[in-house]
C-alpha cells in the first residue's frame, strides 16, 4: 500500500557514452510548472464548464486499462484541474515516474526529464495510499485528463520509437530507445510495457540484443532477462534499461504471451500437502472473494520463508521478483513499508537475525522451520551499556520508522546509511568499541556499513554521548516469545488468538481512518494444524474492514491470524503467476512470505512417503 525507474544520478558511464549531444531540433521543453497555465485546456479536450466542488472516485483508466485507485480532482476554468491528487503507486508503477525522497521529507518526481518537487506538506493520504498533486507533471508530458463520474481517464498518445541503440557487450550493457515523445512505462512481473509505436524491424533489433518482444494495441512489451531496470530521460525523450551479460537472441511474437503454466513442482503437491482454494463468502450483507493456500508444515516438503531483496532494507520490488529469487512456489506480500522512502515499517527476522526491528508493539508472527507459527504483539527492547554500567535505550533497529531517540543500524540495512531526517548525529561502533563520532553533514553524505559495524544515530536533539574508544555492550530482548523464533514478520493489527477476536488497532498505533476503511487484505493465519496464506477482496465494493476480516477468518476455522499490508500491495503468487492483484495491478512492495521447497524435497512426497 504504501519506482521503478532509476534516478538520473545512477545512470552508468556506458549509457552516458550513448547519449547524444544537445540537439535543439530534437529537444523537448523540460517543463517544471508549479501550477497549471491559467486558461489552458487539456490537450485535445474541449473546454468544460467549471465545477466548483471537488470530484473524486475509485477507478482510474490509463490508456484503456482500468484499476481500482482513489483519486481527487479540483477543477478550474477550461477543464484543466487546478489540483489532481493521485496515489504515488499509480504514478510509479503504472506510468514510470521516478521518485527520490529528500531528508526533509519532500519528494523529487521525474518523468522523461520533466520534474516536480513535492514538499512533505503537499503529500496526503487517499485511503491507505500516499498521494501527491500530479497535474503539473502529467500536463507537461501531454497526458489528457478527464473525469467521468467515478472514473478518471488518463490518455497518453503513443509516441513513435525513433531508434534502438545499445552499448558494447559487457557487465553493464544498456539499451537506449529514442522516442518522439514521453511514453507510459509500466513494469509488472518481470515485463516492461512501453506505450509506443514500433516497427517490425525495430522489434527485430531488440530481439537480436536478447530481449524478448511482443507488440499489442497498448504498445511494446519487453521481457529482458533479469527483469530489467528502467530509466526515463528527457531532451530528447528516451527509455534506458539494462540487459545481463550473455543475453542471446530473444523471441518475438505478434501479441502478448499467454500466462505461464503452473509450476510442475506445485502441481505435484496439490491436494496432497498443499491446498488451494478460491471462494466467495457472505459477511453480513456484503460478499468477499477469498483466495487461500494452506499446508501442514510438518508434512509438506515446503518451508515458510521470509522474502526480501538481497541488497538490504532500502528499496521496493515486485512480489513475482521476490518469489522467483527464492524459487518460492507460492508467495504473498508481507509487512508494511514507507512508499515514499521505500523502507520497512515492522519486524523482519530471518535465520535468527534481525533485518528490521518491530515498531509500536504491533502484531507479529514467528516460526521455526517445519513448525506452526505463533502470534502476538511484539516490541524489541534494546539498550547500549557503557563501561560505568549506565544504559541507553535504543528506539529502533534498521527501521524506516523515524522518531526521537537513538536508532541502531547494521549492514543488514544495506551497504551504507544516509540520513533520514535533519540534524542527525551518530557514532560508528565496531567490536564493541566506538571508532568514530559523526556529524550531520557526514550522515547526509552517507556512511558505509561493514559486516561488523553498528551505527547509532541520534535524532531530534538526542546526541550519542560516547567518545571515541568507549566500550559498549548491547542488550537485546523481545517482549513476546514470538520474537524469539528464528523467523519473524511484523504486520498488524493482530486479528485472532486462540480462536478469539483480539482486534485492537488503536493499541498498535493504527489511525481510526485505517481501522474503519474497507480494503483488499492479506493475512497469515493458522487453524492449529495448517498454516494459511490468504487474500480477501470485496465483490463490488472496496474490500473488507478489519472487523469483517476477523469475522470471516473465524468462519473459515482459523484460530490465529495477523493482518499484513493490504490495499494495492495485496498479492498472491501461485506457481509462476501473480493470481491476485489487490487493486487490479501488481504494485511494488518491500517484502513477502513464500513457500519454498526444502532441498531435495520438492517432488511431491517426503522421503520414504
Indicate residue ranges for each PLM-predicted region.
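Bacterial N-terminal signal peptides that target proteins for export
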Residues: 1-11
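Gly/Ser/Thr/Pro-rich low-complexity, intrinsically disordered segments
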Residues: 9, 13, 17-70, 74-83, ...
